[in-house]
Amino acid sequence: MKLQAVMETLQRQQRARLQQELEARQLQQDSSEGRTPPSVGYPGNGSEEAEPEALKIQRAQAAALAAMRAAAAGLSQQPSPAASDEEEEDGESMASDEEDEKERDGESERYPDMGSEEEDLKGKWDEDDFEDEGEEDDYEDMEEGMGVSEAGRVGKGSTLPPKHPNPQAFPTQRSVGAERAGLPHTGHPQLQDHGDWTYEEQFKQLYELDGDPKRKEFLDDLFSFMQKRGTPVNRIPIMAKQVLDLYMLYVLVTEKGGLVEVINKKLWREITKGLNLPTSITSAAFTLRTQYMKYLYPYECEKRGLSNPNELQAAIDSNRREGRRQSFGGSLFTYSPSGAPSMLSSPKLQVSALSLGGVATNGSSLSSMQKIKKEEDSPISLTVPPRIPVSLAGHSMVAAQVAAQAAALEQLREKLESGEPPEKKMALGTEEQQRLQRAIQHNLLAMTAQLPMNIRINSQAEGRQDSAVNLTTNGTNSISMSVELNGIVYTGVLFAQPPTSASGTSKGSSNRTGSIGGGSSTSQAAPPPAPSAPTSNNPSP
């Protein structure tokens, strides 16, 4: 902005000085015309003098352009007396040229306003040249925008009369700018051609992967078929940083019986080796299947008819279900505490079933779903019959309980997989379920000394308020229990009983004190006494 302001000031000073000199010359011209006849205004050879006048105008414009460029180049320095003298000399030369133009205007009355128009045109040329200088300085810094700036300069020059005697100035500037930038004149079409070349090169590589004469015939037929089908092949798939050989993929799959057979028999490893692809590629089977379905399966159905889309979908669904069965639960229960028995270290678990002893409160059973949570808040949901819901915290409790379940269920699974009659399998299943319940109860009681346990049970019976059960361990063989029902809190202690019989129970008694609406009671119970109302039973089936 400062540079532009200085330029405008300089232009105004030069114009004022030129105007003064022109007025002085005009007075002298008027005095000389008073002594000579006015026949000069209509010369017989006017056409011959018109051409030199046009050349004078062009020279004047060129001189003005040179003066403006010199002024723009010296703006960063302080104006010196010598520079001012040069500017005055340039101004005088421009004044003489302007005087010639004025004389021509005086001789021809058809163009009375030519002088003012010439000054306006010169002002416009000066401003445009100043902008051109700024753009030329940025040539090397604006390589990509070179074409746009050049087009803008040509557009400006086309709106005004030619100011240079050499009309090839702009093409020369463009060529120089192109050499500086190191880019051709048509940069964007060059990029587009490069993209087309890459696209064609991929097809060329696909055609030239080997010398099989059937390759070209197959690829031509495939591409024409996909084009007619409305799904043209717009790009060649890339796998392992190389072009995927669609021809060999089609040959290998059809030799195996088609895509459905390859999926059902899991033959993708052989096809991967046949394509000379690295065996270390992750999900190579999925990638090959999806690429085959996209580019080759419609062609297979049309030409060979080895399968149909319904069979393909069924094969994919079956493969997905098998994958889920194989990966279910195998790695979820591998954690085993150091102090756990060796029978609890089996990592296999394929059937989830867990039932714990229920707590009967005034004849009403509390039932819900059970969720076991680790400290990382990763839930493991286990299917539970209508029994007590338990929420445990801690790695040891979770691992021990799940490991005990896994050990019992592993034995159950091995027996069920042995070819025994269904009736015997059902009987064994019931027996193993009972054994599992007893093992879980035993392990829960054995672990109370290692890990504090807080069990809260919520249930809502019909016509009753929420009930809650809190269990807290006090030692190795006792559990403090607190039950809140209809606003009344019942507390007691449950003692462990050796599992000598299947129907053995752990009994505790509590004395009820308090009032309805939030009363609390505290009781001390001993193992032998008979239970009193309310009772808390933990039967094992």
Swiss-Prot record:
Keywords noted in UniProt: Cytoplasm, Developmental protein, DNA-binding, Nucleus, Transcription, Transcription regulation
Region (Important for cytoplasmic localization): 497-504
Main subcellular location: nucleus
GO biological process per UniProt: regulation of transcription by RNA polymerase II
Record text on subunit structure and interactions: Homodimer.
One example GO MF annotation: DNA binding
InterPro entries: ARI3A/B/C (IPR045147), ARID_dom (IPR001606), ARID_dom_sf (IPR036431), REKLES_domain (IPR023334)
Region (Important for nuclear localization): 408-450
Location(s), subcellular: Nucleus; Cytoplasm
Keyword Signal tagged: no
Protein name (database record): AT-rich interactive domain-containing protein 3A
Domain REKLES: 407-501
Composition skew (Low complexity), residue ranges: 55-73
Region listing for Disordered, in residue ranges: 17-172, 499-541
Entries under PROSITE patterns matching the protein: ARID, REKLES
Cellular component terms (Gene Ontology): cytoplasm; nucleus
Function: Transcription factor required for smad1 and smad2-mediated responses to TGFbeta during mesoderm induction.
Residue ranges, annotated region (Homodimerization): 452-473
Superkingdom of source: Eukaryota
ARID domain segment(s): 212-304
